[in-house]
């Protein structure tokens, strides 16, 4: 290490010695919140005054043996001057080569043929044990794999059968139920007119109209209950339908009088001119929404 100083011999002669900074009171310096060189001049004067009044505690210092035979005997200190060439010597000024060389494999020590053969047998036995352990793990994996596959297939079959039973339910009669039915392309007035036109001459009550709609158009079996209010609103607000009382002869004594709904003359024209024309135009979509699509000609008088 090349230390760039003017008088090298003088500085090198101070190796391991404490040439200066001996008047720095380190004992009192430890009690200060900051070093004195960081304070202002007034604070430095005050600190020096306090130092004069306060005596630092006596710190026992024992001389230690010097293990460095090259330099003079000295006690290590905070301000000790050292020669870097002695403390951390460097052989060459060039940076060491950092390329790692691959070392050849060390041969077996030639202590004897018997030792070499014993070592060779030990290595072979270890390799055989490793391969046997690896093969046992493979056998365990392959032996448990078919059972695991069978359990998975059984679970899949059970889940698929449950899904199939939920989706494909058989109803009463020759017709199979669908998972979801489309909404018929008809207004509620058309549905009411269709139900009353297919009824006997005496008419139908509100519950019978509900049953007719659910029977031929299964969409309303799972639809929200609001469609019933819409049908009642059409019955009461449109002039195509009228409410007629039931004959007294048909009613038993002691029960309130009931009413039936029928088509008026305007309602019959509405069925012929509007409902039948709509059935001609949307025949296929209506058949898809019907539970018995073969009855479309009979219901709509096509």
Curated annotation (Swiss-Prot):
One of the record's GO molecular function terms: DNA-binding transcription factor activity
Major subcellular location class: nucleus
N-terminal signal peptide: none
DNA-binding feature ranges: 183-285
Cellular location(s): Nucleus
SMART domains: FH
Coiled coil: none
UniProt keywords, alphabetically: DNA-binding, Nucleus, Transcription, Transcription regulation
GO cellular component: nucleoplasm
Keyword Endoplasmic reticulum appears in the UniProt entry: no
PANTHER family for this protein: FORKHEAD BOX PROTEIN R1, FORKHEAD BOX PROTEIN R2
Identification of the protein by name: Forkhead box protein R2
Record organism: Mus musculus
